[in-house]
């Protein structure tokens, strides 16, 4: 699936190492390989964006290595491809040896997988399913400031799905653990790959059922009900959290205006 990059190869370049992304001038590189000193590197095409190939190169650059969060304002499709590249690079880096027998592994030529040369075990990139849910109570939405977001951003509740748990059960558990309330009328909305580090966000909307807000201080700094026309600082556009909030606001406007 991979090949050596030549001088006239062009497209978008995802150069990644240890979950970092090469961002010269703070941007995802685009153009001919020769312009970025990438000729001769081994690359894997991981998709296309607006008719141009998107290449993954597993390489550590001395300067300008940053987080994929820095390109979150890109078009959603290109951001997802950048996230795919970072996740694949880390997968290949962390699966050089078989977890069963310890022998060296090699990449599959037909799919994104690593194969053991000894016991023939096959490994795929790990994906961690998560839930994220917007909770509405009359004309208000529950928004929280997470301990990991100390920049004033308020967002909806989210968490990882546990082993042996349905998505619906995960929503009920996470909401109760983080905020102390119960929800009802759960409705699936959409999903979004989220490379922090390898999540798949499954988005829901729900209605408040019962209980008072009691936050988990290990997870949240605060949580409150906010009227739809008086909201705090929100996640950036393009995130599934922002979509859930905007969808909830639209529902409130339709009912209360």
Curated annotation (Swiss-Prot):
GO-annotated biological processes: NAD catabolic process; NADH metabolic process; NADP catabolic process
Cofactor note: Divalent metal cations. Mg(2+) or Mn(2+). Binds 1 zinc ion per subunit.
Positions bound to Zn(2+): 98, 101, 116, 119
Role according to the record: mRNA decapping enzyme that specifically removes the nicotinamide adenine dinucleotide (NAD) cap from a subset of mRNAs by hydrolyzing the diphosphate linkage to produce nicotinamide mononucleotide (NMN) and 5' monophosphate mRNA. The NAD-cap is present at the 5'-end of some mRNAs and stabilizes RNA against 5'-processing. Has preference for mRNAs with a 5'-end purine. Catalyzes the hydrolysis of a broad range of dinucleotide pyrophosphates.
Alphabetically ordered keywords of this record: Hydrolase, Magnesium, Manganese, Metal-binding, NAD, Zinc
Organism domain of life: Bacteria
Protein's gene: nudC
Similarity comment: family membership: Belongs to the Nudix hydrolase family. NudC subfamily.
UniProt protein name: NAD-capped RNA hydrolase NudC
Molecular-function GO terms, alphabetical: magnesium ion binding; manganese ion binding; NAD+ diphosphatase activity; NADH pyrophosphatase activity; RNA NAD-cap (NMN-forming) hydrolase activity; zinc ion binding
Enzyme class: hydrolase
Residue positions binding substrate: 25, 69, 111, 124, 192-199, 241
Record's GO cellular component terms: cytosol
Residue ranges of the motif Nudix box: 159-180
Annotated catalysed reactions: a 5'-end NAD(+)-phospho-ribonucleoside in mRNA + H2O = a 5'-end phospho-adenosine-phospho-ribonucleoside in mRNA + beta-nicotinamide D-ribonucleotide + 2 H(+); NAD(+) + H2O = beta-nicotinamide D-ribonucleotide + AMP + 2 H(+); NADH + H2O = reduced beta-nicotinamide D-ribonucleotide + AMP + 2 H(+)
Cofactor: Mg(2+); Mn(2+); Zn(2+)
């Amino acid at each position: 699936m991979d090949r050596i990059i030549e001088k006239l190869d062009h497209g978008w370049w995802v150069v990644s190492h240890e979950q970092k992304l090469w961002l010269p001038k703070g941007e995802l590189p685009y153009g001919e390989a020769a312009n970025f000193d990438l000729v001769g590197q081994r690359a894997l095409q991981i998709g296309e964006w607006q008719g141009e190939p998107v290449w993954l190169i597993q390489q550590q650059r001395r300067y300008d290595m940053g987080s994929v969060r820095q390109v979150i304002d890109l078009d959603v499709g290109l951001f997802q491809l950048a996230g795919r590249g970072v996740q694949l690079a880390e997968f290949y880096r962390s699966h050089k040896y078989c977890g069963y027998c310890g022998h060296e592994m090699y990449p599959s030529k037909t799919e994104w997988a690593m194969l053991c040369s000894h016991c023939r075990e096959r490994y795929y990139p790990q994906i961690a399913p998560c839930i994220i849910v917007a909770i509405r109570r009359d004309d208000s939405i529950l928004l929280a400031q997470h301990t990991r977001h100390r920049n004033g951003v308020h967002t909806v509740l989210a968490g990882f799905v546990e082993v042996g748990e349905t998505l619906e059960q995960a929503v009920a558990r996470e909401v109760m653990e983080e905020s102390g309330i119960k929800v009802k009328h759960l409705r699936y909305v959409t999903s979004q790959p989220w490379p922090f580090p390898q999540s798949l966000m499954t988005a829901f909307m729900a209605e408040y059922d019962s209980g008072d807000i009691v936050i988990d201080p290990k997870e949240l700094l605060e949580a409150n009900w906010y009227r739809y026309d008086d909201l705090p600082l929100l996640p950036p556009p393009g995130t599934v959290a922002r979509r859930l909030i905007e969808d909830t606001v639209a529902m409130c406007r339709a009912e209360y205006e």
